[in-house]
Amino acid sequence: AAYTREFFSDNVYRYSNAGKYKNDPSHGRFDIPHAVVYLNYDFGKGWTMGSEIEFEHTGTGVSFEKEYEESGEWEQEVEKGGEVELEQFWIQKRFGRWLNLRMGHIVVPFGLTNAYHEPLHYFTVYRPEGEATILPCTWHQTGVSLWGLLGSWRYELQLLPGLDAMSFSRDKWIQKGAGSAMEFAVANKYAIALRVDNYSIPGLRIGLSAYY
């Protein structure tokens, strides 16, 4: 949980002169910016399942919102600014160290941040702006994955629904392409994602990812 002090007022006209009130100490906010729930289970005989549910700002719900374009009129909205995302929900069959078959909603390991998106794997509080600006982050889609370990190498090959090119932009490249305005992901085209990592040198990871 987090507590912050920031500018907020019920008087819409104060926003047109924010500099006048920049030192106003009377406003604060409690929030839970980010919470993640993991649930995994081992069925035995090589079968496992995994899931990851992410909550941002305590999730969605009904909230009141001030419309500044309508002279500060209050409106009741169905959604709050938070999010609830099912980032992973898959079942996996292990055939050996060298081959695992994973099916369901999976993370696409394109780029370093997506491949290692858990906060324990990077040093900053926020994800790197470079990747997060131009790539879906965290990039998760429903598909099939083959992955395994061969010596000091790790590979992963995925079959996925293709990105939505209508959501590409000049400023954010393919960032919005993994989303969908529907209740499902449109899969008129299919895509392949591949990632290869090498761990030959202790403490050093060298990787390459591709998407087609």
Task: Identify the role of each PLM range.
Residues 12, 62-63, 169:
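Short acidic, glycine/proline-rich loop/turn micro-motifs
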Residues 1-19:
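Transmembrane beta-strand segments of Gram-negative outer membrane beta-barrel proteins
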Residues 1-7, 25-165, 188-193, 197-205:
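Outer membrane beta-barrel
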Residues 15-17, 163-212:
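Surface-exposed beta-loop-beta
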Residues 21-23:
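Short N-terminal helix-initiation segments at or just after the protein's N-terminus
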